[in-house]
């Protein structure tokens, strides 16, 4: 997850440098298109990962995904032309898109009852840590070196992470049980069962929530430095805001995870969306710098931290035999929002709006996400109570879902 966070923020941190790189002469709209190639790869990786997970296990799938991300980073670092840079970004997306659908159900199954959100939040902190590291690298090392160095650091980080993951990442207990009992590995039908009654409405709801969350995360992380530049902040301060945004996602995300374990998922998810919207709009004001820093941290809690809560909400709303399929479908379809985020952000900035309206436009997905979460109500819990028992086990899903 740290590697995923590094990639997510690396592109946003290097966006101003890409626009200023004279040999390529890139427009704002074209950089937005480049930013969308990674989410396209994520969409494909998320939808296909179930087949690899069923065949090779969640641990092995995660290790392969880390290697793919690292290879894509090296391709970006060595790219002599924008087209090859775009290919590298797409390859990175394939790997990143496969990581969480393989790891998410594993985390959920290993976490003790009543601590599902907390354990997921702790793992999700890796995304914020990686994002903060990417922003720090951009802030301290890129001056005078160009954007290629950022991606070289990311590729090296992936290579260093592989042996650590190989040594310490456990396999799913469910997968071990199936193999040791000589039972056939699940054939992936869970991916299609989640698209049939009584789960169809729940799946559509989660796809929409994930789509709005990813649109917000990728849009803000890609364009926050440029947004702050339009508000007359220098580039170095603008990159500092990325560090604070991901700090807020770490600290605030854990606080919201603890709340979700006590009160259920729906309220904290709604609160995160609303906090994100309010903070993004507040960033457009000329606030004293310490106050602005606090606002950006709050924005990170809401805009970036919400996805970890949604991931657990998905996992706890389906039986164990459908859990990986549900996460893969919801996050895969939700990646459409990740594709749209950088592109829409590029269009907004290219439209030449007043700086305040740029920020308001970026806050709209957060408002829609809060409204959708409130309107969804207890659909997940209702569908869970109507569902048939699991074909292999009568295992209940965990915890409250409203």
Regions found by a protein language model. Give the residues of each.
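Helix-breaking motifs and short loop linkers at transmembrane-helix boundaries and internal kinks
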Residues: 57, 78-84, 112, 264, ...
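Conserved MFS/SLC helix-loop-helix module at the cytosolic interface between two early adjacent transmembrane helices
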Residues: 44-80
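Extracytoplasmic gate region of multi-pass secondary transporters
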Residues: 12, 198-253
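Paired small-residue
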Residues: 68, 72, 83-91, 290-298
């Amino acid at each position: 997850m740290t590697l995923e966070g590094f990639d997510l923020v690396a592109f946003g941190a290097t966006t101003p440098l890409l626009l200023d790189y004279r040999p390529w002469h890139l427009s704002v709209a074209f950089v937005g298109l480049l930013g969308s190639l990674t989410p396209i790869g994520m969409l494909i990786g998320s939808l296909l990962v179930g087949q690899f997970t069923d065949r090779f296990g969640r641990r092995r799938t995660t290790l392969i995904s880390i290697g793919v991300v690292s290879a894509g980073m090296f391709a970006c670092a060595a790219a002599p032309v924008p087209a090859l840079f775009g290919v590298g970004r797409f390859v990175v997306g394939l790997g990143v898109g496969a990581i969480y659908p393989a790891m998410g159900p594993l985390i959920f199954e290993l976490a003790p009852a009543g601590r599902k959100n907390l354990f997921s939040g702790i793992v999700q902190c890796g995304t914020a840590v990686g994002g903060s590291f990417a922003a720090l690298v951009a802030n301290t090392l890129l001056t005078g070196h160009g954007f290629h160095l950022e991606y070289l650091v990311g590729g090296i980080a992936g290579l260093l992470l592989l042996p650590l993951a190989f040594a310490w990442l456990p396999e799913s207990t469910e997968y071990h049980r199936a193999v040791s009992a000589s039972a056939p590995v699940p054939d992936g039908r869970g991916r299609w069962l989640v698209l049939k009654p009584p789960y169809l409405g729940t799946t559509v709801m989660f796809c929409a929530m994930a789509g709005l969350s990813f649109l917000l995360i990728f849009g803000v992380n890609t364009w926050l430095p440029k947004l702050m530049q339009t508000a007359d902040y220098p580039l170095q301060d603008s990159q500092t805001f990325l560090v604070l945004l991901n700090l807020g996602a770490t600290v605030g995300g854990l606080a919201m995870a603890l709340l979700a374990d006590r009160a259920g998922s729906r309220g904290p998810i709604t609160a995160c969306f609303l906090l994100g919207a309010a903070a993004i709009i507040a960033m457009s004001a000329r606030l004293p710098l310490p106050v602005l820093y606090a606002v950006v941290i709050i924005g990170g809690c809401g805009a970036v931290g919400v996805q970890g809560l949604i991931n657990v909400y998905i996992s706890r709303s389906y039986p164990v035999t459908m859990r990986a399929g549900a996460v893969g479908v919801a996050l895969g379809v939700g990646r459409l929002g990740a594709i749209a985020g950088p592109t829409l952000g590029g269009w907004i900035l290219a439209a030449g709006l007043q700086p305040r309206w740029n920020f308001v436009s970026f806050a709209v997905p957060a408002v829609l996400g809060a409204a959708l979460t409130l309107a969804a109500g207890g659909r997940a819990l209702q569908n869970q109570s109507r569902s048939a028992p699991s074909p292999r086990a009568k295992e209940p899903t965990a915890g409250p879902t409203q």
